[in-house]
Amino acid sequence: DLLLYRKLFLSRSDKFEDQYEGTFSEPTFEEIRKLSINNPAFLDYYKSHRENVVISSWHINEYESFAMWQIFTQKSEGLAIQSTVGRIQEALHLDKTFEQHIGEVNYIDYKKEYIPFDNTFFPFLFKRKSFQYEREIRIITDVTSFDLKIDNGLKIDVDINQLIEKIYIHPKSENWYKNLVIELVQRLGFDFKIEKSDLESDILI
């Protein structure tokens, strides 16, 4: 879909599997609750805000992650895009409608640690420590001011050639799948480097 339509999908934050997505830790929630005693709209805003924030999640790492292949792909078919923060920033300049923000996720203890709320993006840059393996960096867009009805997410224009540095193919994929990906990419007029993941390369013993 990304290659065919040259648009990047950002998922509505409250549709993520993690029910804590975009919420506050206990210490922060207690402070917000006190502040909202005389102003209920203050708390209501944060509850509804999640519906207007969309996110694209990326894994930041020097090396491939076997766990990420296992969790986010089905069977032996799937692709991983290699990029850099700089390339992502440049690629997003193509979209003139929405403003995107890029930030690295912090992993904290939601029962003990505090999440700042002086910026409306902060709740979306924190997750529970049990998600540390994701090493996530995010593209975040707030569409509140656009008065849009978003179902599952939003597609934004993106410079594909700038975004994608290399494509990795699932380590357990068959040759026919690799050839199919190469043919599709060529037909669409792209010349990305395409490699099969070496996580399943031949052992040396």
Roles of regions detected by a PLM:
Residues 1-205:
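Partner-binding and oligomerization surfaces adjacent to conserved cores of proteins
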